[in-house]
């Protein structure tokens, strides 16, 4: 007699991203109470399981939802606000002045727009660092994605706190509010070495230890940052942070562009995870992170889009393409960054960066965070190697379905938890606000 389950999901092809990287033709997944109960051939699953709901995606490819290892979701509201500038000019001359006027309502609106973009292009979980993160998590709660959120901690006031001394109490309060949420988690997120002091970074380390939270930090993004760190602290960013005890297996570092070979060895020894953001690094001309060297040392890398103000997209499929192509031409070696390794970064590596066990793969016992791509799209045929298609051919807009915890959040152009037309009306109003902030800052 078939076992009961909530949902049976069927499709022409399943890319599991399990340890064996199994690919199943004419497959199905049994889902019960938000988790994958079984995955296998369609006939076997249908014969052994009875689903209260059956979703037949037909000529689609099912795979784990992508994981964005580093972004600032609310910065969708600043997309295209300032382009073609070096990082520090972009930040201090354009982004920081506008962000001074942010409110919780605006952060929530921008985060919801970011969630919509991510679902539409196959991302079901993300690591966020921004301002007024309670508002980001309200958007996450509304949209249904998973999120590791970190309130950016600075050595100066932010829209979330007038006094940096109160930032730590704010993070504690956020942790208390969200620690039992099924899809949200908190990180301690000192923004960067150049926006912090040694005392603030040490307190971030202590707070993370106290609450059992991971650390999320921008580090070694540019050579300018390195020079400034040497001038102010007498050390390069990586050894400086190591001396403060910030580099642990619970730490994810965004960017890590300007590294020495010895620093790569140190990061590998400490078990740190790196969120590689190739498109943002290219657009800001920050440099090229030594991703292949880090992978060669056995490090875990996730893939991140960074914010839509510096990318200008939250599309993880295009990020995968850029990652693979960038490292091939940088090293003049077509074997660098193979499709399988880049796909791992966008799934399993991202899951590791978010410290969320089981996502980024499709196998029994894992959360049912799943997407389906339309194989009827001309660019998706013929299929010889699914990983190749996902990294080099897919655009993200083939996404037909996005599911988190067994719940359908997006299906064939429709969002199940919010109205996109209503959201866009509010976004257009926010554009007027952003333009006013720009004028006031000049």
Curated annotation (Swiss-Prot):
Zn(2+) binds at residues 70, 72, 218, 306. Binds 1 zinc ion per subunit. Disulfide bonds: none annotated. It is an enzyme of class 3 (hydrolase). Its EC number is 3.5.4.28, 3.5.4.31. The keyword Hydrolase applies. Keywords: Hydrolase, Metal-binding, Zinc. Substrate binds at residues 99, 191, 221, 306. Gene3D superfamilies: Metal-dependent hydrolases, Urease, subunit C, domain 1. Its cofactor is Zn(2+). The keyword Metal-binding applies. One of its GO terms (molecular function) is metal ion binding. It catalyses: S-adenosyl-L-homocysteine + H2O + H(+) = S-inosyl-L-homocysteine + NH4(+); S-methyl-5'-thioadenosine + H2O + H(+) = S-methyl-5'-thioinosine + NH4(+). Pfam families: Amidohydro_1 (PF01979). Catalyzes the deamination of 5-methylthioadenosine and S-adenosyl-L-homocysteine into 5-methylthioinosine and S-inosyl-L-homocysteine, respectively. Is also able to deaminate adenosine. Belongs to the metallo-dependent hydrolases superfamily. MTA/SAH deaminase family. This is 5-methylthioadenosine/S-adenosylhomocysteine deaminase.
């Amino acid at each position: 007699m078939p076992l009961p389950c909530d949902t049976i999901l069927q499709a022409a092809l399943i890319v599991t991203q399990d340890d064996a990287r199994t690919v199943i033709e004419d497959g199905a997944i049994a889902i019960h109470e938000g988790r994958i109960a079984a995955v296998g051939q369609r006939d076997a699953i249908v014969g052994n399981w009875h689903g209260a709901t059956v979703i037949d995606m037909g000529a689609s490819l099912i795979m784990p939802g992508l994981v964005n290892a580093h972004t600032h979701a609310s910065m969708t509201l600043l997309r295209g606000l300032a382009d073609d500038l070096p990082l520090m000019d972009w930040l201090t001359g354009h982004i920081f002045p506008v962000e001074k006027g942010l409110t919780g309502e605006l952060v929530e609106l921008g985060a919801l727009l970011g969630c919509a973009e991510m679902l539409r292009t196959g991302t079901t979980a993300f690591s966020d660092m921004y301002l007024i993160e309670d508002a980001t998590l309200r958007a996450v709660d509304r949209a249904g994605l998973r999120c590791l959120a970190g309130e950016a901690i600075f050595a100066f006031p932010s829209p979330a706190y007038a006094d940096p001394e109160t930032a730590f109490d704010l993070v504690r309060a956020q942790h208390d509010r969200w620690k039992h949420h099924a899809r949200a988690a908190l990180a301690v997120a000192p923004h960067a070495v150049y926006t912090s002091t040694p005392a603030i970074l040490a307190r971030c380390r202590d707070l993370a230890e106290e609450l059992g939270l991971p650390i999320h930090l921008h580090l070694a993004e540019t050579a300018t940052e390195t020079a400034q760190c040497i001038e102010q602290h007498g050390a390069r960013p990586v050894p400086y942070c190591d001396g403060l005890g910030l580099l642990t297996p619970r730490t994810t570092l965004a960017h890590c562009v300007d590294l020495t070979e010895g620093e790569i060895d140190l990061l590998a020894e400490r078990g740190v995870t790196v969120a590689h953001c190739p498109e943002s690094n290219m657009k800001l001309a920050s440099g090229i992170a030594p991703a292949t060297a880090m992978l060669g040392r056995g490090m875990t890398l996730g893939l991140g889009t960074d914010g839509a103000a510096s990318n200008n997209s939250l599309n993880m499929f295009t990020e995968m393409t850029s990652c693979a192509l960038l490292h091939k031409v940088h090293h003049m070696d077509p074997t660098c960054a193979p499709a399988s390794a880049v796909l791992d970064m966008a799934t399993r590596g991202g899951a590791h960066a978010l410290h969320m066990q089981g996502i980024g793969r499709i196998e029994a016992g894992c959360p049912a965070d799943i997407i389906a791509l339309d194989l009827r799209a001309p660019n998706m045929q013929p299929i010889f190697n699914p990983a190749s298609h996902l990294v080099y051919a897919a655009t993200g807009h083939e996404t037909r379905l996005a599911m988190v915890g067994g719940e359908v959040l997006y299906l064939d152009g429709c969002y199940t938890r919010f109205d996109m037309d209503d959201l866009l009306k509010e976004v257009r109003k926010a554009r007027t606000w952003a333009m006013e902030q720009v004028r006031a800052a000049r």
